[in-house]
UniProtKB/Swiss-Prot annotation:
Enzyme Commission (EC) number: 3.1.1.61, 3.5.1.44
Disulfide bonds: none
Organism taxonomic ancestry: Bacteria, Pseudomonadati, Pseudomonadota, Alphaproteobacteria, Rhodospirillales
GN (gene name): cheB2
PROSITE patterns (UniProt xref): CHEB, RESPONSE_REGULATORY
Active site: S173, H200, D292
Protein name: Protein-glutamate methylesterase/protein-glutamine glutaminase 2
UniProt organism field: Paramagnetospirillum magneticum (strain ATCC 700264 / AMB-1)
CDD domains assigned to the protein according to its UniProt record, in alphabetical order: CheB_Rec, REC_CheB-like
């Protein structure tokens, strides 16, 4: 018999706590090790017991979810899935910063069993807990998660012909927000190319994610609008439940079927870049589940674009990068801290 995944639930609301116990306890993969009401209780329990994964509320009495994440990752590193309500910008900001501090993913708080979205939401919570329980987390200094920058980023390796590349496309899923903060921070405010981004994220968190990205990186992040002409200094994020594409150097918002079970899809973005700018594009596949982006990246590579996938050593989940590499779509496979250096080199100097 397969060993069950031990889950520690940290949630102060009695209603939500009981609902999480029901959702997780009804899945035969899990064992609810305990359900506590505060971060302090969680930390005390971790002194003597080790869950496989923690379901962590953000808004708690006393210590909030961000501070709890920092302490957990410095004292007793454990995979953390943040469970957040989409109620206000402050809660979303805390949730996103918890990712920077070492939490692995954010999911939406469950709704009542009679709600139309209950089954989908419950399945997503269980999927995230199961996947994240397998991630090998490491001890982090108390401030490490809030200090992503370019310190670990190698210097540019060469200079060549400016103007070879005109645009960067990025796709990310699980682990993406924290990876993007590190990557974009390493690019610097003088990075000369527009950036188009597909981030798989719960729709109710998208606007908060975009605001958070603007506040934590040198770039202005915004939800892409149909007909916009991308310019340097901005990150154009695919909107909720629509694909993002590029036609005649302008953004297009497409209401087409999902690709690789994703809408928006990185493959749609990359495919449009391959057709529109060919060898002048750069495509990057970051951490994430599934295979989205792999076929589109192959199309970019076939057109002579520069294609990069994140190395497994720095991925939270190595699904999408591995799928792209398996297709032969990756010109380079790089650990996350090296990707920014390579992008700067390409944008400012051409090919290596």
């Amino acid at each position: 018999m397969r060993k069950k995944i031990k889950v520690l639930i940290v949630e102060d609301s009695l209603v939500v706590r009981e609902l999480l116990k029901h959702i997780i306890g009804s899945d035969e993969r899990f064992e609810v090790m305990a359900a506590v009401t505060s971060a302090e209780d969680c930390l005390e329990m971790l002194e003597t017991q080790q869950p496989d994964v923690i379901s962590l509320d953000i808004r708690l009495p006393g210590m909030n979810g961000l501070d709890a994440t920092l302490k957990i990752m410095s004292r007793r590193p454990t995979p953390i899935v943040v469970v957040a309500a989409q109620v206000d910008d402050n809660e979303l900001n805390i949730a996103m910063n918890a990712l920077r501090a070492g939490a692995l993913s954010v999911v939406e708080k469950p709704v009542g069993v009679t709600n139309a979205g209950y089954d989908t939401m419950a399945a997503k919570i269980c999927t995230q807990l199961a996947i994240m329980s397998q991630v090998q987390v490491v001890r982090q200094g108390i401030n490490r998660g809030l200090n992503f920058g370019s310190d670990d980023t190698p210097a540019r390796v060469s200079q060549g012909r400016p103007g070879t590349y005109s645009m960067v496309g990025i796709v990310a899923s699980t682990g993406g927000p924290q990876a993007l903060v590190q990557l974009l921070g390493g690019l610097g405010a003088d990075f000369p190319l527009p950036i188009l981004l597909v981030q798989h994220i719960t729709s109710s968190f998208l606007e908060g994610f975009v605001t958070w990205l603007s506040g934590t990186t040198p770039f202005e992040a915004r939800i892409a609008q149909d007909g916009e002409k991308p310019v340097a200094g901005k990150v154009y994020v695919a909107p909720v439940d629509h694909h993002l594409g590029l036609v005649n150097d302008q953004l297009v918002i497409l209401d087409l079927p999902a690709v690789c079970n994703q809408k928006p899809s990185g493959t749609v973005l990359f495919g449009s870049m391959a057709r529109d700018i060919g060898k002048h594009g750069i495509g990057v596949v970051l951490t994430g589940m599934g295979a989205d982006g792999s076929e589109g990246l192959r199309q970019m590579a076939d057109k002579g674009a520069y294609t990069i996938v994140e190395d497994a050593s720095t991925c939270v989940v190595n699904g999408m990068p591995a799928a792209a590499a398996k297709l032969g779509a990756a010109r380079e496979t790089l650990p996350l801290p090296a990707i920014a250096a390579r992008l700067r080199d390409l944008a400012l100097g051409g090919e290596k």
